[in-house]
């Protein structure tokens, strides 16, 4: 685990974005942890979040021309990541996002920001069922652009309805790499460093045994 990944876990815990306990997911599964990126909701939170996304992007080595944030949660993430890349990595790259409803006046269309072209890095909070990615792919392809990769905050590394995860399905269907700031494996490594969190570690490991990929 790299220092920025450890820092991200501490940051997520401090904001209660990452919580341990018993949570029922949309799928009906009972999970020993929950991640709600919507709680990164202040200016400082967003600035820090952008730095973690930028760090993971640079660390991945994937080449891309533009950041795309799917509405709605992806919009602030794409914006803060673009700022962090420019401020901390000297990479001044364009960004763009979609509207859920197309405008029929003014500039029109359903895209805001830079022209959607070239190699696109899609940024979002998490991938649950992959629906937002599929909708975004239609927009990217309709504009003649290509998908360079997908960046999310957390990869839960758990099976979907079948034997593989929603993330593995996206990688297979779109022949792209999905990268994340942290994975379930990183989270377990972090818990292993904290004796006071042994109870949570046991629960998360048991969950991985049952649902992990």
From Swiss-Prot:
Listed GO MF terms: magnesium ion binding; orotate phosphoribosyltransferase activity
- Specify the pathway: Pyrimidine metabolism; UMP biosynthesis via de novo pathway; UMP from orotate: step 1/2
| Domain of life the protein comes from | Bacteria
Q: Which CDD domains match?
A: PRTases_typeI
Q: Which GO cellular component terms are attached?
A: cytoplasm
Q: Which Pfam families match?
A: Pribosyltran
Q: What is its EC number?
A: 2.4.2.10
**Names of required cofactors:** Mg(2+)
Q: Which InterPro entries match?
A: OPRT, Or_phspho_trans_dom, PRibTrfase_dom, PRTase-like
The chemistry this enzyme catalyses reads: orotidine 5'-phosphate + diphosphate = orotate + 5-phospho-alpha-D-ribose 1-diphosphate
The protein's enzyme class: transferase
Write out the residues that bind orotate.
Answer: 34-35, 128, 156
Which keywords, in A-to-Z order, does the entry hold? Answer: Glycosyltransferase, Magnesium, Pyrimidine biosynthesis, Transferase
Keyword Membrane belongs to the record: no
Q: Does the record's keyword annotation contain Iron?
A: no
Residues at which 5-phospho-alpha-D-ribose 1-diphosphate binds: 26, 72-73, 99-100, 103, 105, 124-132
What is one process in the GO biological process aspect for this record?
Answer: 'de novo' pyrimidine nucleobase biosynthetic process
Instruction: Give the record's family classification.
Output: Belongs to the purine/pyrimidine phosphoribosyltransferase family. PyrE subfamily.
Q: What does this protein do?
A: Catalyzes the transfer of a ribosyl phosphate group from 5-phosphoribose 1-diphosphate to orotate, leading to the formation of orotidine monophosphate (OMP).
Under the heading NCBIfam families, the entry gives: pyrE
Assembly: Homodimer.
HAMAP family xref list: PyrE
- Annotated protein name in UniProt: Orotate phosphoribosyltransferase
Q: Source taxonomy lineage?
A: Bacteria, Pseudomonadati, Pseudomonadota, Gammaproteobacteria, Enterobacterales
Q: Which gene encodes it?
A: pyrE
